[in-house]
């Protein structure tokens, strides 16, 4: 089948061929990274070379490029570590604005850089794309274009303030900010478990289902 070099070449050719009109392309690459934790290392150099070639060819002159993962490594020993949990909840997101945007509206690119160390999510990326659409149709003020939707995000091209996971629209289940804490002592947990099992056994006994007693 096709290898990852083909889609990246297609992206370059696509941006060059349609450089005179607005376009959108989504390429999903999984060959080297999905099932192998070490695959990223072998893919990293090749991808960097491809991006440099695209930059030299002019394919990125007016292209807003987003390189992102949909999730981290979700199985295996690494996924059970603290770092593995963080990467799963906060996958890679790299945003490369075109030179034309920095020349025409440098404050937007400056906002993007300032937001680099803030908590962001896919909601913010969605609003960023809406922001770009507003710029594409020549709106001077884009606030009314990309706010007021069902998305809780904010454009990464706008100034952002430090936020909590709740404020950023991130479920607490996927929030990597709080540290893991032991909520109860082992002895208390054991007592609770024994009490629950006893209640279940009492409930099942008169039913005569032949169930083995839980312990």
PLM region spans:
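Membrane-interface soluble catalytic domains
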Residues: 1-5, 9-16, 30-34, 41, ...
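Class I S-adenosylmethionine-dependent transferase superfamily signal
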Residues: 11, 47, 51, 65
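Long acidic/mixed-charge intrinsically disordered regions
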Residues: 23-25, 64, 132
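Flexible, surface-exposed loop/gating regions in the mature catalytic domains
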Residues: 25-28, 49
């Amino acid at each position: 089948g096709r290898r990852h070099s083909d889609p990246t070449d297609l992206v370059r050719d696509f941006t060059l061929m349609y450089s005179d009109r607005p376009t959108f392309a989504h390429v999903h690459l999984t060959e080297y990274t999905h099932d192998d934790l070490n695959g990223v290392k072998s893919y990293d150099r090749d991808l960097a070379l491809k991006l440099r070639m695209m930059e030299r060819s002019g394919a990125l002159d007016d292209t807003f490029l987003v390189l992102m993962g949909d999730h981290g490594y979700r199985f295996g020993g690494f996924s059970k570590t603290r770092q593995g949990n963080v990467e799963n909840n906060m996958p890679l997101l790299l945003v490369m604005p075109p030179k034309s945007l920095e020349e025409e509206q440098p404050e937007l690119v400056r906002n993007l850089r300032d937001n680099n160390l803030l908590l962001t999510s896919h909601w913010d990326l969605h609003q960023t794309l809406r922001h770009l659409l507003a710029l594409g149709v020549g709106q001077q003020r884009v606030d009314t274009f990309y706010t007021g939707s069902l998305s809780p995000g904010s454009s990464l091209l706008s100034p952002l303030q430090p936020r909590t996971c709740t404020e950023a629209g991130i479920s607490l289940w996927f929030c990597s900010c709080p540290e893991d804490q032991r909520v109860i002592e082992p002895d208390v947990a054991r007592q609770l478990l024994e009490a629950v099992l006893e209640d279940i056994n009492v409930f099942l006994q008169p039913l005569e289902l032949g169930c083995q007693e839980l312990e």
